[in-house]
């Protein structure tokens, strides 16, 4: 199942779809609900894929000109040296300009090709994350609590100041 999970709140693709279905508290694969594409392919590559949706750790571009993954047109395949793809996982899919485009969290910084990716590229990000054992960056809970306390204190302090209507309207 190559379906992507879109966030119901904003429609962005953020998580890897494990596929399957949950029966009696366990995720199982059935003919109606097979394993997700990333989980299936990662298993073939010898990695253990998660059984729950996990955030995608988007792979960075090597530079401004190149994509995170090498891409080749099918018309040039016959001219490529076999060593280029030998022993590698190769995904074959369409990279069309209008169809099969999915908004990702990267659309915040680039609303073009990086932010609206073809499905095959989203799957490639998920597969390499599992095979490389990468996790998405997270903020430690202590930082979250500290920032929350700081801004709550700052907001409370500002609200206690009585500097007239100009100050209150300006904030």
Specify the residue positions occupied by each region the protein language model found.
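Flexible inter-domain connectors and hinge/loop segments
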Residues: 1-153
């Amino acid at each position: 199942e190559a379906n992507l999970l879109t966030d119901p709140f904003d429609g962005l693709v953020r998580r890897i779809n494990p596929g399957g279905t949950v029966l009696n508290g366990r995720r199982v694969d059935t003919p109606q609900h097979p394993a997700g594409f990333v989980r299936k392919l990662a298993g073939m590559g010898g990695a253990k894929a998660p059984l729950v949706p996990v955030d995608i750790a988007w792979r960075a571009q090597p530079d401004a000109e190149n994509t995170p993954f090498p891409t080749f047109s099918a018309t040039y395949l016959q001219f490529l040296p076999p060593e280029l793809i030998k022993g590698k996982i190769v995904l074959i899919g369409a990279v069309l300009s209008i169809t099969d485009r999915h908004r990702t969290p990267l659309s915040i910084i680039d609303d073009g090709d990086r932010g609206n990716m073809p499905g095959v590229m989203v799957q490639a990000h998920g597969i390499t994350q599992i095979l490389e054992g990468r996790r998405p960056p997270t903020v430690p809970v202590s930082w979250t609590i500290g920032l929350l306390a700081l801004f709550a204190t700052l907001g409370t302090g500002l609200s206690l100041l009585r500097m007239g209507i100009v100050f209150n309207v300006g904030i």
